[in-house]
Structure formats: structure tokens, C-alpha cells
């Protein structure tokens, strides 16, 4: 069964027990931390992203034999030893800044893979899990079902699977919140964004206290090298860093509209503003030369992006926008596409 079939199976089984489709869709959206409309759109288009297969199998109560899926389906890629060491060094430095005694904590590596982080984390104080252990010190366990039965203090540390738009990484963070005081993860650069729908805005119980770009050298389980654009972030329950607080932006001078004009209503957004904006910017594209200002919506890569209206000093703002290096303002996703978010645009002005 594919993801679409599994979702339909769940709905049908719930209906057999007197639970309406609407109620089940609401429950699934909460479990997956998605908008209800997203689930409804999947059903309408009969196209559920394959990345949600494991999530839906768990909801359906299906047994998962991970050996039947390849490493890309499981979103597995391993951290380079020097990257693991750098992350731990950053962590120790930040814990000193916040006067945290790390000797009082146990560490949990939730997706240990080949065990690279076990070489840098305190061996006598680290628990390591993975759905497919590749190291003798790693226990076979689905971290998303793990809850310690004691009241000890925990730090969750590692490189979780990312999932589609970071959905798996978000699940790992939020599950950690049930027992841990800190989460220290390698994450997709999407977690740097504070735009609408950003996984950063859906993190529960934690405050972001540190975030920085790190090396992009990783490895698939078969040894193939891969470049992945990532951040290392530290999230805390009890500490805050004003530098990373999400702030409201002033749109009295600059107004940013998300624009798209697809074939169906679900693919259309703010179409009335198309042709009425002062400049246009891509929301995503490949190649830094394409992440630039456009005079027309029709010229945008994929004909999707942002329209910007300047409420005063139009000539000055347009000139300023043309001089901004939008490629450097954007962030790279794991597939090297450049992404721009509304918050980043407003910050640039």
C-alpha cells in the first residue's frame, strides 16, 4: 500500500467504528502537525506524499519492516566525524555561556546510524537508538515511541531524519520535549526560517538559543558522499536567547504578498495582486543568478513567489531592492534549491 491508500484505509476503518471522516482528518492533522486543509487537499488530489508513509502506517497500527525500504525512503544519511565533533564543541561552549552543568545530564542519540556521535558524547552517559542499528552500542528502538521511566535529566543530541519540509525532524524535537531539557540537532536550513508554515514555529515547549550553519559533507549508508545544507541548533526548555526570538515585522512601508496562479484553487494565492506589485521575487529556485528581482510575475521561476508593494518612496525602495544580493538573503534546502521567506524579505529593508 502506498501513502494515499494507507490514509484512505485509516478513514475507512475509523468509519466502521462510527468515527466520521472529518473527525479522523482532524485527528490525523494534529498527529502529523499539519493544517487540516493539507490532509483534505491530499485526499482531493489522491496524492499523499510518500514521505508520510511511515507516519500513516503507525497511525494505522501497521507493523513496519524497515528492511523492506531503502535508505532514501528512510531519509538516512550519516554525519561526518569532524562535523559531529564540531557540533559537540559548539554545544559545550553554549552550555558554559548559560552556566549549565552538563555532568548532571544523560544524553540520548535518537537516530544513531553508524554511531559517529558516540565517539564525541560521554560514553558512560549516552543512550543510542536507531530503527536499524549499525553499531554495537546502538539499541534497536523507534525513538518516537521511547519515553524514559525515570526522572533523570536528559539532553537529546544528534542528526535526526529530516522528512518532507522537516516534518520528521520536527517530530523528533517535539517528542524530545516530553522528557528532555535540551535538544541539540543537525537540521535542514528550513528551521532557520520564521515564515508561515515554518517548522520552527511549530516546535513545542522549547526555545531556540543557538543556530549556526555547519559543514555540508554527509554520507549515505552505502558510502556515497552527499552534500546537505544544514544548521546546528540548540533548543532549551528553561533558557532563552533574544537573538532568536521571532519578532513581528512592520509592514506599513513594505507589503509582501505570496503569489501563485496554478490550475486549481488550492494552487492559487493572491491572484488579484498579480501585475499590481512594484517588484517580484522567487520563493524558491535553483541557481543564485535566478534569485533576483523581477519586473513581472510571469518572469518568475516556476511562476510562483512574492510580490512586493512599497507604500512610499517607491523609486528609492526599488533601487535598494535591485542592489540586494537576494541569494545571500535566501537559505538553501537539502537539495540545494534557494528559498526565500517573507520574514527574510522584510528584514532586508
Language model features with spans:
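Class I S-adenosyl-L-methionine-dependent methyltransferase catalytic core
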Residues: 1-349
Amino acid at each position: 500500500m502506498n501513502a494515499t491508500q494507507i490514509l484512505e484505509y485509516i478513514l475507512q476503518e475509523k468509519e466502521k467504528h462510527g468515527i466520521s471522516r472529518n473527525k479522523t482528518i482532524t485527528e490525523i492533522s494534529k498527529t502529523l502537525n499539519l493544517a487540516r486543509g493539507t490532509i483534505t487537499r491530499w485526499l482531493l488530489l489522491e496524492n499523499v506524499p510518500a514521505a508520510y508513509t511511515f507516519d500513516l502506517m503507525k497511525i494505522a497500527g501497521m507493523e513496519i519492516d524497515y528492511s523492506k525500504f531503502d535508505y532514501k525512503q528512510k531519509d538516512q544519511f550519516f554525519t561526518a566525524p569532524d562535523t559531529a565533533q564540531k557540533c559537540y564543541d559548539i554545544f559545550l561552549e553554549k552550555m558554559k555561556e548559560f552556566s549549565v552543568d552538563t555532568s548532571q545530564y544523560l544524553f540520548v542519540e535518537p537516530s544513531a546510524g553508524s554511531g559517529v556521535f558516540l565517539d564525541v558524547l560521554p560514553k558512560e552517559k549516552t543512550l543510542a537508538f536507531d530503527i536499524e542499528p549499525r553499531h554495537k552500542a546502538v539499541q534497536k528502538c523507534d525513538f518516537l515511541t521511547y519515553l524514559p521511566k525515570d526522572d533523570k535529566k536528559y539532553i537529546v543530541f544528534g542528526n535526526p531524519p529530516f522528512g518532507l519540509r522537516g516534518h520528521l525532524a520536527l517530530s523528533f524535537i517535539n517528542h524530545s520535549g516530553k522528557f528532555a531539557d535540551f535538544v541539540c540537532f543537525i537540521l535542514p536550513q528550513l528551521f532557520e526560517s520564521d515564515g508561515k508554515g515554518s517548522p520552527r514555529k511549530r516546535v513545542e515547549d522549547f526555545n531556540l538559543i543557538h543556530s549556526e550553519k555547519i559543514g555540508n559533507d554527509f554520507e549515505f549508508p552505502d558510502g556515497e558522499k552527499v552534500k546537505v545544507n544544514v544548521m546546528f541548533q540548540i533548543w532549551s526548555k528553561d533558557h532563552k536567547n533574544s537573538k532568536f526570538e521571532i519578532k513581528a515585522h512592520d509592514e506599513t512601508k513594505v507589503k509582501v504578498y505570496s503569489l501563485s496562479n496554478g490550475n486549481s484553487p488550492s494552487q492559487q494565492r493572491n491572484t488579484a495582486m498579480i501585475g499590481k506589485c512594484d517588484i517580484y521575487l522567487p520563493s524558491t529556485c535553483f541557481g543564485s543568478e535566478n534569485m533576483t528581482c523581477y519586473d513581472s510575475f510571469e518572469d518568475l521561476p516556476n511562476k510562483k513567489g512574492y510580490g512586493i508593494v512599497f507604500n512610499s518612496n517607491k523609486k528609492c525602495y526599488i533601487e535598494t531592492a535591485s542592489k540586494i544580493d537576494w541569494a545571500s538573503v535566501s537559505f538553501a534546502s537539502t537539495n540545494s534549491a534557494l528559498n526565500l521567506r517573507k520574514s527574510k524579505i522584510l528584514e532586508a529593508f
